[in-house]
Curated annotation (Swiss-Prot):
Pfam families: EFP, EFP_N, Elong-fact-P_C. Involved in peptide bond synthesis. Alleviates ribosome stalling that occurs when 3 or more consecutive Pro residues or the sequence PPG is present in a protein, possibly by augmenting the peptidyl transferase activity of the ribosome. Modification of Lys-34 is required for alleviation. SUPFAM superfamilies: Nucleic acid-binding proteins (SSF50249), Translation proteins SH3-like domain (SSF50104). Signal peptide: none annotated. GO terms for biological process: peptide biosynthetic process. This is Elongation factor P. Keywords: Cytoplasm, Elongation factor, Hydroxylation, Protein biosynthesis. Pathway: Protein biosynthesis; polypeptide chain elongation. GO terms for molecular function: translation elongation factor activity. The gene is efp. InterPro entries: Elong-fact-P_C (IPR015365), NA-bd_OB-fold (IPR012340), Rib_uL2_dom2 (IPR014722), Transl_elong_fac_P/YeiP (IPR020599), Transl_elong_KOW-like (IPR013185), Transl_elong_P/YeiP_cen (IPR001059), Transl_elong_P/YeiP_CS (IPR013852), Transl_elongation_fac_P (IPR011768). It comes from the Bacteria. One of its GO terms (cellular component) is cytoplasm.
Amino acid sequence: MASVSTNEFKGGLKFMLDNEPCSIIENEYVKPGKGQAFNRVKLRRLLSGKTLEKTFKSGESFELADVVDVELDYLYNDGEFYHFMNSVSFEQIAADVKAVGDTAKWLVENDTCTLTLWNDNPITVTPPNFVELEVTETDPGLKGDTQGTGGKPATLSTGAVVRVPLFIAIGEVVKVDTRTGEYVGRVK
């Protein structure tokens, strides 16, 4: 397996730490006036999703994680697993609830998602940046009710709750940014 030195650390790099794949979020190289240089790294453990900060001596080396990102289409959820398919080879992969996590509320059938595989098992699922979902439940917007600019909560077809403008009604389709969970616009 290939190794990587702390001198080569950069955001997005995936390496093994304590036999668990980790991804670097931020890396800062520090050279104090006295003593040895070091890297202050903010990283995310890919299996547990936990974020932590660590410092590594300059020149330390680590094994690169054998992690692969693949684009797959979301098919369905059978209650236990979420099923995805490669649209070229038609190979199907099942991801458990732990791998999907909070992203389940943004999964729409036939949307292309990014799955991170480690040892051919899905460890994280990333939905597309934007999804279009139907509003299934929201309060009616009252005419003249413009006192607050915060909008109103709306429940979407996947169960996600998003703040929308007052003019959005039940049955309308809205575009939502899955990274922030914010309303982007109304789909015509």
